[in-house]
Amino acid sequence: TKACGPGEWVSYFRGGPRHTKAHLDEAIDASLARLQTDYVDLYQLHWPDRRTNFFGQLGYTHDQDAEETPIDDILTALESLVVSGKVRAIGLSNETPWGVMTFLEIARREGLPVVASIQNPYSLLNRTFEIGLAEIAHRESVGLLAYSPLAFGVLSGKYLEGARPAGARLTLFDRFSRYSNPEATRATEAYAQLAKAHGLTLTEMALAFVTSRPFLTSNIIGATSLEQLKENID
């Protein structure tokens, strides 16, 4: 499970969620109660508690006045959850190369829990992970839990030729336009032709690409029907 970071869109969580000890303690206790369990194997920070760019945002803007929780304080808070037995391992999500390396450096220097994984987007349409994070994941043993391997379903091919299937994500939510720009559409069309030439569905090829990466630990598939689930697993 995860603890979300700060953001106006989640201000109703805990009066404005942060990664302070008080917030993380409250968040894990609530998660354990909902899950009806005494512990979780992996506890992730959903996005950073500092001003940086994530969720597909390009460009970093520094704001020296922005509030943020120091990473050593975050790790100390997470250590208490590990010691208490509520959490077995910790992970990051939607993190940057600087963030991952800083978490690792402080943890090793101070004897605090070392990050085990990072859950970031990765697909044939989003390979930004390869720029600075792939080598870190591989050499530092911080396994990638790749989310959105089908790029919001675009790499299933269901949106080709302008189609908008009823109930599909991009049909319901126009704001998810990250993978529906002209460049992504042209790339998807080319990938579909390549998959067909090799006797594969676009979904099969897209998922196989992600799964074959040496820095991958888990490919997080998503399905809304048994048919989709079968194709994802096959």
What do the predicted segments below correspond to?
Residues 1-2, 41-45, 145-149:
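Non-cysteine beta-strand/loop elements that form the S-adenosyl-L-methionine
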Residues 1-8, 118-122:
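A short, structured active-site edge motif that brings together acidic residues
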Residues 10, 26-28, 174-177:
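Intrinsic disorder/low-complexity segments
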Residues 48-234:
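Beta/alpha (TIM)-barrel catalytic core signal, keyed to glycine-rich beta->alpha loops juxtaposed to Asp/Glu
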Residues 24-39, 132-141:
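Short amphipathic alpha-helices and their capping/turn segments at secondary-structure boundaries
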Residues 17-35, 71-76, 100-105:
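Short, acidic/polar
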Residues 5-20, 51-60:
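Surface-exposed, active-site-proximal loop segments in enzymatic domains
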Residues 33-56:
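Active-site groove signature of glycoside hydrolases
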